């Protein structure tokens, strides 16, 4: 349990689990009725396309801040919430705060450092929307605390997909984020996980679809750049063929923002050489969009 100087509530949505989870939740609900506030579903809602947090959790959240911890993951520091809330209380221009974490590979019983650690940054790192658009990623769901004021349900329901990338894009439109250097949680990797069960090609396709969902609402250069940062990564040719219609739609978006010549060259690099866009090229495109916006 977390040790904090402030009260908190734990909002749980049990999506018709059948593995004994409900019994465990009920046990803790009886012990801490003022803290544990569950919803028990008789039928799985996620499989029906229901956006769980938007429908069941965000509307009933009363706190000034919201933190995530999905059922597969866990926190390891008892002062995690206190540290993050203290930071946000003293830095009003930040809308979210994350921290470092470790990976638990359940099949092997192995715990490793995260895939993309912060190097030589003992004081942590600030990040913004531009960082996210360029492919930066300094958070897992279990590590994030954010201000409840950044939640606008009417805005979020416009997006057809409701995954991490969409939420963080919306949050970072409204302010900066900060990643603490402290390791305060563990992300579980296992075959039954929604994300970790996908192979690399499917993960990249899923991310690409999420970015298109953002563009369908935003229709800005920034949203197109967010597509580009994912689109430029190598992906299996078979996957491209299978998702042909999706790639056609994305190609039209990129041509509208960056020109047919550039997109054609990128397609040739992808299909013939399986190359991705280099960092300097991406920065040049980002700078072009910024100057176009200023004009």
Short names for language-model regions:
Residues 66:
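Short aromatic/hydrophobic "clamp" motif used to bind/position activated sugar donors
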Residues 41-61, 83:
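Glycine-rich, basic loop-to-helix element that forms the pyrophosphate-binding segment
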Residues 59, 99, 117-202, 207:
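Conserved nucleotide-sugar donor-binding catalytic segment
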Residues 22-26, 63, 76-89:
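Short alpha-helix within the catalytic core of nucleotide-sugar-dependent glycosyltransferases
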Residues 1-43:
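Acidic donor-binding segment of Leloir-type glycosyltransferases
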Residues 79-113:
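Conserved donor NDP-sugar-binding/catalytic core segment of glycosyltransferases
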Residues 236-295:
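Membrane-interface aromatic/basic loop that binds lipid-linked glycans or pyrophosphate carriers
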Residues 70-74:
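The conserved acidic donor/metal-binding loop of glycosyltransferases
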């Amino acid at each position: 349990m977390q040790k904090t100087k402030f009260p908190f509530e734990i909002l749980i949505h049990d999506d018709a689990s059948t593995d004994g989870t409900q019994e465990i939740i009920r046990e803790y609900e009886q012990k801490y009725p003022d803290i544990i506030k569950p919803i028990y579903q008789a039928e799985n809602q996620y499989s029906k396309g229901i956006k769980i947090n938007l429908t069941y959790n965000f509307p009933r959240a009363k706190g000034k801040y919201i933190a995530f911890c999905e059922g597969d993951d866990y926190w390891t520091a008892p002062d995690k919430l206190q540290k993050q809330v203290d930071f946000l209380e003293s830095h009003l221009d930040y809308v979210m705060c994350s921290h470092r974490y470790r990976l638990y590979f359940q099949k092997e019983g192995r715990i490793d450092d995260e895939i993309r650690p912060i190097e030589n940054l003992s004081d942590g790192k600030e990040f913004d929307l531009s960082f996210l658009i360029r492919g930066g990623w300094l958070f897992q769901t279990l590590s994030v605390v954010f201000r409840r004021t950044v939640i606008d349900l009417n805005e979020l329901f416009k997006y057809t997909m409701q995954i991490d990338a969409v939420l963080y894009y919306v949050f970072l439109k409204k302010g900066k984020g900060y990643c603490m250097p402290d390791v305060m949680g563990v992300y579980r990797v296992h075959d039954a996980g929604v994300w970790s069960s996908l192979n690399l090609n499917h993960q990249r396709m899923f991310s690409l679809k999420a970015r298109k969902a953002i563009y369908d609402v935003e229709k800005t250069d920034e949203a197109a750049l967010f597509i580009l940062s994912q689109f430029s990564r190598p992906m299996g040719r078979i996957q491209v063929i299978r998702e042909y219609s999706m790639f056609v739609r994305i190609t039209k978006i990129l041509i509208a923002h960056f020109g047919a010549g550039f997109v054609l060259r990128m397609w040739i690099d992808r299909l013939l050489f399986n190359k991705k866009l280099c960092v300097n090229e991406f920065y040049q495109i980002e700078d072009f969009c910024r100057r176009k916006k200023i004009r």
